[in-house]
Amino acid sequence: MSGAEEAGGGGPAAGPAGSVPAGVGVGVGAGPGAAAGQAAAAALGEAAGPGLPDEAGLAGARQLQLQEAAGDPDAPPKKRLRAAEAAEAAAAAAAAGSGKLEERLYSVLCCTVCLDLPKASVYQCTNGHLMCAGCFIHLLADARLKEEQATCPNCRCEISKSLCCRNLAVEKAVSELPSECGFCLRQFPRSLLERHQKEECQDRVTQCKYKRIGCPWHGPFHELTVHEAACAHPTKTGSELMEILDGMDQSHRKEMQLYNSIFSLLSFEKIGYTEVQFRPYRTDDFITRLYYETPRFTVLNQTWVLKARVNDSERNPNLSCKRTLSFQLLLKSKVTAPLECSFLLLKGPYDDVRISPVIYHFVFTNESNETDYVPLPIIDSVECNKLLAAKNINLRLFLFQIQK
């Protein structure tokens, strides 16, 4: 026991409230702990005055003690490290307590997973912990990939689309919190920020009106008029513009070719479509893998099955931030002649997932009755997580039989 501890614990009765026993930090053996005690006593005395120590005084004394412990060369390294971390946390807490109300609300209303303010829907578990829509869907998708029950990262209660509900009060409160424009750095309510950044901000990034003839300029809106007055593209010769336009037309041609192909397929004699429901299953391997399969369905008087896999059945898809789905079409019935088909998958009538149409072709025979795995053309990993978070994946399959 140090001299400070002996004086604090075994001395005579304490003096008036707010005073410090005279023996604190005095006597043989008083070292760095005594300095911490004196600093704490000073903080308590200044904050509380003649009355009892208030909360601010106690917090200040605690922070000074932690700083002294962190700087004590005789303390064990682990203790110094813990004290330094605790001092930083105490300083952050003190700073947060003295900030504006909206700044303190950020930590109250933020998502418990990404620690950011939700941009759209806010979900809560049965104990009230908040999750933004993106993180909520991602938790459900990860649980599906790992064959586990999804749980709240805070309280570990079970979460699902049926157990969790939206918190409209938090959504409205977040929409009224001020947020900084990324261009002009002014503060606006979050509900008005998107409109400001798209239509009103003078510093928003915009494009030249001559981009249709190849001008690549991007810049702030308040410089647009000056640039367009000096833009060189309107004065280019016809041959120069033709070279630029040829490159711009290539992507447009590919898109038009795709839609023309779809229109041509719609004129075929034998066309079939059906709603398909991919259901999750697990392989029988030692390390199971998630895959999806539909019940058998009949289209064009034939029996079919669809299968799908995540990230091409990689070992740990839950460790990857990029999520993809690929699928294959299997013919389950026997055919007397080769069956040449075109097929494509689109979103179902009640889903909001974004899928780009891609046409695939295959000739089915009794010996070759399944296609290779082909990519499901989902826009990005966020849309893929939406599908994985659902109990089942509902899509619409179109089949076109090619007759010769």
From Swiss-Prot:
Pfam family, one: Sina_RING
Cellular component, GO, one term: nucleus
Chain positions of all zinc fingers (TRAF-type): 152-225
Biased composition regions of type Gly residues, renumbered to the chain: 1-13
Keywords tagged on the record: Cytoplasm, Metal-binding, Zinc, Zinc-finger
GO MF annotations in UniProt: zinc ion binding
Zinc finger residue extent: RING-type: 111-156
Predominant subcellular localization, coarse grouping: cytoplasm
Chain spans, region Disordered: 1-22
Compartments in which it is found: Cytoplasm; Cytoplasm, Perinuclear region
Key word Zinc present: yes
The family this protein is said to belong to: Belongs to the ZFTRAF1 family.
Quaternary structure and partners: Interacts with LGALS3.
The protein, known as: Zinc finger TRAF-type-containing protein 1
Native organism taxonomy: Eukaryota, Metazoa, Chordata, Craniata, Vertebrata
